[in-house]
Amino acid sequence: MLTMLRSRCRMLMRYLHVGIVMLSSLLVCTSPWIIMLRRIPDNASLWDYLHVYLGLVCTGLGILFLINNCLQGKWRQYFGWLVGDGMQLKQDIVGLVRGKFPIAGGKGLFSAIEGIGMLLLVATGLSGLIWFLFQGTATAIEWRGYHQLFAQAFIGFLVVHLLLAISHIIDFIRQ
């Protein structure tokens, strides 16, 4: 029974990235249609409700994704620079300045960018959650601002992440 549960958890973790990509894409693409300030309006549209509740789901998935990627010492791959282990990151940046494209994996530039992306995803979700919890108060407006700031940074990450994924695929095809 325990083995089956572990197996199902591993399977869930494999699909977590896909689920986050799909939900994030939907949330980002529909966000221009969202009209909320201090609280969910009385005449809220389907898009408003979808954004709020799918955002809450995405927040939970983002937290699970971050935890899963930080377990068993894997956090050092994404955040090694926090403990002074930035040699590969430094080499990647120096190589990039010299026109050499960094390799994917390890503790280099790509992994550091992915780590920052995970933090931005969770920050976007948590700021949205806090905005939701404080709706109807003056504090909600403040958290709306934080949510928008983190969301814009996360969108920037998505663009960079997509470009890096495409470059990785092109590099893979060349070899």
Which residues does each predicted region cover?
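Membrane-embedded alpha-helical bundles that constitute the cytochrome b-like, heme-associated redox core
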Residues: 1-175
